[in-house]
Amino acid sequence: MLQLRNEARCLPGCLDHLRGHVDGIVALDDGSTDGTADILRREPMLLELLSNPPSDDATHVWRENENKRRLLEAARRHGAGWVLVCDADERYEQLFLRHLHAAVDSLPDHQLASLSLVSCELWNSPDAWRSDGPWGRKSRARLFRLPQKISFESSSELHGPWLPDDAQRHGLMFYSRYRLYHLKSIRHADRVARRDLYTRLDPARQFQAIGYDYLAQEGPGLQLRRIEPDRDYDRRTLPPDLQAAQSPNPSVLAKSPR
């Protein structure tokens, strides 16, 4: 399941890395003005494409909870029992994708179970992720059982979870060490753009008390972990400009635990 806006740069690789591991794709194009919708329409795995009217960044209104509700209802129309969520600028590690169906089989089918993954922000390079401070403690619930009732009344409109209300209140969360890698933290320019976007959307820090400056900060405490060969994602699915990013300085690398 994909919610996207102006992701023509990262979307082709995202679809490539999911293909063959999921049974189908339901997507919502949130008013894109680039080629995002055209890329989705060409995808053989696409079951349904939802859309919002095109809008420029100055006038676009983010309605994340409504988008999520529409996506989950579409997934249910297509017979989905379990949902895997992915952003266009994210890549699941190959180990997780190989184990995906076994992971679903291992979770309780009669309860609103969900699986959380470690969220790894790639930093300055496609082969290293940031692990100091809040960066080393991020996790995301991205695989979950689809509930009968789909609502997001208790979720914030920005940075809210993908889990519907019933799953948050009554479900069981299982925490895994599988990894989800974020691509738009590789380049400094992308980190600054992300910081500026969220600062504009949430100037009073209503949805995140820590604010957003940290998204682009480094400092002397910067610590990176190189991705082990058996924990990698499919780097062939990176956009060309990110494939060319440099490897990290050895002085900021820490030994990565399994």
Model regions and ranges:
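Short beta-strand/loop segment that forms part of the nucleotide-sugar
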Residues: D23-G31, S51-N52, A88
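Active-site nucleotide-sugar/metal-binding loop of Leloir-type enzymes
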Residues: N65-W82
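Short hydrophobic beta-strand elements that form part
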Residues: M1-L2
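Short beta-strand-to-loop acidic/aromatic patch adjacent to the donor-nucleotide binding site
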Residues: G79-E93
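A conserved acidic beta->alpha catalytic loop
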Residues: D29-R42, P53-D56
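Catalytic-site signature of metal-activated, phosphate-bearing donor transferases
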Residues: V61-R69, E93-R258
